Amino acid sequence: MKTHTIGIIMNGVTGRMGTNQHLIRSVLAIRGQGGVRLANGDMILPDPILVGRNPDKVRALAEAHGVSRVAPSLEAALADPFNRIYFDAQTTDRRAAAVRQAIAAGKAIYCEKPTAADTATAAALYRECVAAGLKNGVVQDKLWLGGLRKLRALIDSGSFGRILSVRGEFGYWVFEGDKQPAQRPSWNYRKEDGGGIAIDMLCHWRYVIDNLFGKVAAISCLCATHVPERRDEQGRAYACTAEDAFYATMQTDQGLIVQFNSSWCTRVRRDDLLTLHVDGARGSAVAGLRDCWTQSAEDTPRAVWNPDIEQPIKFFDGWRKMPDDPSHDNAFKAQWELFLRHVVNDEPFPWTLLEGAKGVQLAEKGLESWRKRAWVEVGAIA
């Protein structure tokens, strides 16, 4: 048995998502389990090196989690041939320049979404990787969530019969930063800094819809900035220049209607922060982050409209919770393991930077639809 130790440059992981999901729950968790085992018994052991704009934060993060390697600069990390993978979790407006540095250094590229601030740049990054012969990928974590894996199994088994419609609801209340600290960074609400929920979340819904319900063909979208002023990390008031909610209707290439509401200004009264409600001729399902509930045509209650009496049907009681999958793992970690297998053992990895560009494209088309107050076609990326 051989161990393939592989250096991973992790840029911008001092933020909430980078620290928790990518460093702690993915790369360090993989190290903690001894690596990723290949079919021949060999192991892949990731060895992270941290880099970022704030050296003090980077060093503190490394010390807190036992990471021995910290780079003095991105250039120094890229110059070391031991580091074969470049991972980027910076803010969107900084991503393309750093990824291009990594491409020039011949590194495999793996990065968060949005992969760029616009479709042209996102597509160019993919083409540049291909031209350089470099393996590349984008984080599409929600495909490995427990609830969506169960939903995928229902679709594959034909449980729905003909799927009629899909409704997605995502969001929660993000505090304004005055009475309670905000749960999201202030740049999320400034368009000039790459913020906005459309560019953030439509990138996610593109790959979810494409992989479960058919390719997105058209979109009609309305955005809003419901909270006009918030307070930043220093407690200073600032004007919100980016949208904090969008309400989208999409059509797939199979003619399926998919509605998606996403908001940082909503109080949750549903099963989870994200729910996907799928209605089919033979049954329905509601999937959350971890769980999925189903109702067959035979178990569907006979609803009768009568507002003059208390509702006699307890609608939540008519749904069955699907059993958990014991093999389920953290969604980010699951995709990290696949990407490591791809880089070291050339195993398939279809979630390339082209898929990332498609997400950016849908966000741009959604914003275009909002400006035009019209349906906008979503075509192939040239």
Where does each model-flagged region fall?
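Predominantly a Rossmann-like dinucleotide-binding segment in NAD(P)-dependent oxidoreductases
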Residues: K142-C240, R373
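C-terminal glycine/acidic-rich active-site capping loop/insertion
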Residues: R231-E233, Y238-A239, Y247, Q251-T252, ...
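Hydrophobic residues in well-ordered beta-strands that form the structural core
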Residues: C111, N136-V138, R167, F260, ...
